[in-house]
Amino acid sequence: MSGDYYETLGVDRNASKEDIKRAYRRLARKYHPDINKEAGAEDRFKEINRAYEVLSEPETRARYDQFGEAGVSGAGAAGFDYGDMGGFADIFETIFSGFGGGVGTGSTRRRTGPTRGDDLRLDLKLDFREAIFGGEKEIRIPHLETCQVCNGSGAKPGTGSRTCSTCNGAGQVRRATRTPFGSFAQVSTCPDCNGAGQVIEQKCDACGGAGRKQETKKLKITIPAGVDNGTRLRVGKEGDAGTRGGTPGDLYVYLFVEPDKEFTREGMNIHSEITISYLQAILGCKLQINTVDGPQELVIPAGTQPNTELMLEDHGVPKLGNSAIRGDHLINVKIAIPTRINNEERELLEKLAHIKGQSHGKGGLEGFLGSLFHK
């Protein structure tokens, strides 16, 4: 599936809800499995439905715009309800309603209007705790900004522009080609004015007539709690500036989390290990252990077995988008068996072995302690 739901529907990120609905209906009728029997049409139909499911609802669309797929991964993508499209008959009505008139009646003699700026990508590294708790980060981004000298016109202050003589201000040129099948007209962007319809008399010295300049900007962005490797954040209108009055593009920040020496992460749960003595395992105890929230008390039950996993509830990773919900901290318990003991310890252990009816002559101390752990 396409990595971007907007691309799946073929719409701009600023598209209205009606634009999204129209694009969805157009593509859905094209790839509907009862209409399109080509291989892959059904899979394409499911992709289109999933994209519409996310983008048609303001809440899920907002989460997707900010976090990408991670923000909507919980939304149900299984199955498809044909009723979402207003009924199968409605699809056919839409299909055949477009064949009543001519094709290509719109005018092609129009200059290129405002153009949206390009989107930009920035990769940002976070340490383990920054990803869990979020916070503010300062970043520097090189991008194109509107030239402040000419206000984006590209013309030297005090001068202007004239109508392009090549396209007569249309921004496009038409070329007729004759073939054995008739004449065909090919329309392309004017090479002299690049579709603007106007030619600058004297270019701005600051930007060289481009209307934009490369600048490096400092930004403070908010990292939400619970982000993970690959989480994508959208910072609106911080991409490249548009041209001819177009809106700026967006900045997409992709997050990469540095590993931690003590903790690992699995979804919303945090994992760590502790090592205790065989006596602590047999008798039980209370210990202070490190968590992402600081030191916490952990109860080791008497008779704890090697590789037992103990849990501290609500000390894991906050849920992305709802930090009131947290995962757990899971602690794997390792038990240290001593390789050397003093005479007093040996005497006590031999007494214990006698009480338990265990022979300590075979298998050594470790074998004896192992039998204790698995009684």
From Swiss-Prot:
Primary subcellular site in the record, as a coarse category: cytoplasm
Residues annotated as binding Zn(2+) 1: C147, C150, C204, C207
Gene3D superfamilies: DnaJ domain (1.10.287.110), Heat shock protein DnaJ, cysteine-rich domain (2.10.230.10), Urease metallochaperone UreE, N-terminal domain (2.60.260.20)
Domain of life: Bacteria
CXXCXGXG motif repeats mapped onto the chain: 147-154, 164-171, 190-197, 204-211
Oligomer and partners: Homodimer.
Family stated for the protein in its record: Belongs to the DnaJ family.
Task of the protein: Participates actively in the response to hyperosmotic and heat shock by preventing the aggregation of stress-denatured proteins and by disaggregating proteins, also in an autonomous, DnaK-independent fashion. Unfolded proteins bind initially to DnaJ; upon interaction with the DnaJ-bound protein, DnaK hydrolyzes its bound ATP, resulting in the formation of a stable complex. GrpE releases ADP from DnaK; ATP binding to DnaK triggers the release of the substrate protein, thus completing the reaction cycle.
Protein's name in the database: Chaperone protein DnaJ
